[in-house]
């Protein structure tokens, strides 16, 4: 699971497309 509170959002640049898609899917579910 991703804990965005403990992540610097600038590190989104380091995420893989799969991880980005996963977070987008999570956001849609919320």
UniProtKB/Swiss-Prot annotation:
Its EC number is 2.1.3.3. Keywords: Arginine metabolism, Cytoplasm, Transferase. It is found in: Cytoplasm. Its main location: cytoplasm. Pathway: Amino-acid degradation; L-arginine degradation via ADI pathway; carbamoyl phosphate from L-arginine: step 2/2. One of its GO terms (biological process) is arginine catabolic process to ornithine. GO terms for cellular component: cytoplasm. GO terms for molecular function: amino acid binding; ornithine carbamoyltransferase activity. The keyword Cytoplasm applies. It catalyses: carbamoyl phosphate + L-ornithine = L-citrulline + phosphate + H(+). Belongs to the aspartate/ornithine carbamoyltransferase superfamily. OTCase family. This is Ornithine carbamoyltransferase, catabolic.
């Amino acid at each position: 699971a991703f804990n965005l509170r403990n992540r610097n959002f600038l590190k989104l640049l380091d995420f893989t497309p799969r991880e980005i898609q996963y977070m987008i899917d999570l956001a849609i579910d919320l």
